């Protein structure tokens, strides 16, 4: 299966009629494996900060999670595995696998729980596949 198929079939799929706004699979070094059209242009230091939070959980809480210049308030996640952020009616979920970061960005009417389910399900699958 191609990386494009992972994004199209697993991240941008419909959940109860709702879809992620943007999705990406990127290497932990910040290299883009694949991203949806119009995924926010992120900066290398934003990915570095996200990786630092996986290694030192809670490090993003004081400053927020930035992705593509957008600031998200960090909310409950799973230390070392999942970071979740909220901004207004939308938010972001970042799932860490052995080699990659799975990122899903959503807006209403999608719910945080739906975003978490889509992103984390693909992340768990990729972990099982050795990624």
From Swiss-Prot:
Gene Ontology CC terms: cell cortex; cytoskeleton
Alphabetized UniProt keyword annotations: Actin-binding, Allergen, Cytoplasm, Cytoskeleton
Pfam families assigned: Profilin
Main location: cytoplasm
Protein family membership: Belongs to the profilin family.
Quaternary context: Occurs in many kinds of cells as a complex with monomeric actin in a 1:1 ratio.
Record protein name field: Profilin-2
Native organism: Glycine max
